[in-house]
């Protein structure tokens, strides 16, 4: 099982990724984790990436694809792997294709923007303990106060409505086109094309998991 998981921020990809990993016994490939590991280990690509990062630049797709290819050679990838958060752009998808990285499925978790904004902008946190609440789905006993300490809850900057709206804008302009990219490739009938599946990310967590497993058959 070799798959790419797509969906907007706040769609519940992380939760579903954990269930998929467990069911199929495959690792989740995170480019951020790979970069940090390569830099720490001082690999040739890690050294190259560190130079770029230290200068405040963005690590090139070539370096990222190199890291991906190295990562996929490791033993835990023998029965498959799952990409979450990569590729993010068409050039990255092209680079993966040219590098011959095999993909069986592209699974999109679809959630309307209005729902994403409600989910994310409703989050509240008690910073000292890490406890989290939601004004609608998991409210504190007293509005705006932590249940245990009575201290104020805060809305993280990342969860502010305008920040969420900006992240969604980036997703729709850069990452959402990947769905069409992979759909066109699948329709071409070329050998090695992935199957593209779309499921709703609305409803209870176990319902969404059932949809995901059914889509990956």
UniProtKB/Swiss-Prot annotation:
Q: Where does the protein end up? A: Cytoplasm
Which protein is depicted? Adenylate kinase
Question: Where are the annotated segments for LID?
Answer: 122-159
Q: What is its EC number?
A: 2.7.4.3
Quote the subunit structure annotation: Monomer.
UniProt region (NMP), positions on chain: 30-59
Gene name of the encoded protein: adk
The record's InterPro entries line, in alphabetical order, gives: Adenyl_kin_sub (IPR006259), Adenylat/UMP-CMP_kin (IPR000850), Adenylat_kinase_CS (IPR033690), Adenylate_kinase_lid-dom (IPR007862), P-loop_NTPase (IPR027417)
Q: Where does AMP bind?
A: 31, 36, 57-59, 85-88, 92, 156, 167
Instruction: Please state the pathway this protein functions in, per its UniProt record.
Output: Purine metabolism; AMP biosynthesis via salvage pathway; AMP from ADP: step 1/1
**Residues given in the record as ATP binding sites:** 10-15, 123, 132-133, 203
Would you identify the family this protein belongs to, as annotated? Answer: Belongs to the adenylate kinase family.
List, alphabetically, the PROSITE patterns matched: ADENYLATE_KINASE
Q: Could you tell me which HAMAP family the record lists for this protein? A: Adenylate_kinase_Adk
| Domain note | Consists of three domains, a large central CORE domain and two small peripheral domains, NMPbind and LID, which undergo movements during catalysis. The LID domain closes over the site of phosphoryl transfer upon ATP binding. Assembling and dissambling the active center during each catalytic cycle provides an effective means to prevent ATP hydrolysis.
Species of provenance: Aromatoleum aromaticum (strain DSM 19018 / LMG 30748 / EbN1) (Azoarcus sp. (strain EbN1))
The family database entries (NCBIfam families) matched by this protein are listed as: adk, PRK00279.1-1, PRK00279.1-2, PRK00279.1-3, PRK14527.1
């Amino acid at each position: 099982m070799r798959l790419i998981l797509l969906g907007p921020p706040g769609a519940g990809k992380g939760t579903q990724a954990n269930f998929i990993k467990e069911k199929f016994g495959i690792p989740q490939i995170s480019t951020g984790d790979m970069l940090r590991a390569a830099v720490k280990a001082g690999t040739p690509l890690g050294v190259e990436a560190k130079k770029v990062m230290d200068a405040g630049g963005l690590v090139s797709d070539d370096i990222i694809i190199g890291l991906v290819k190295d990562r996929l050679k490791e033993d835990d990838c023998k029965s498959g792997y799952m990409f979450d958060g990569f590729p993010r752009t068409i050039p990255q998808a092209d680079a993966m294709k040219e590098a011959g990285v095999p993909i069986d499925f592209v699974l999109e978790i679809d959630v309307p923007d209005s729902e994403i904004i409600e989910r994310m902008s409703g989050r509240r946190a008690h910073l000292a303990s890490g406890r989290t609440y939601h004004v609608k789905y998991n409210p504190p006993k007293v509005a705006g106060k932590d249940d245990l300490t009575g201290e104020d809850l805060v809305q993280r900057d990342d969860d502010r409505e305008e920040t969420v709206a900006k992240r969604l804008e980036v997703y729709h302009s850069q990452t959402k086109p990947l769905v069409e990219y992979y759909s066109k490739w699948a329709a071409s009938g070329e050998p090695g094309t992935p199957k593209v599946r779309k499921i709703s990310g609305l409803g209870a967590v176990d319902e969404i998991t059932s949809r995901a497993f059914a889509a990956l058959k």
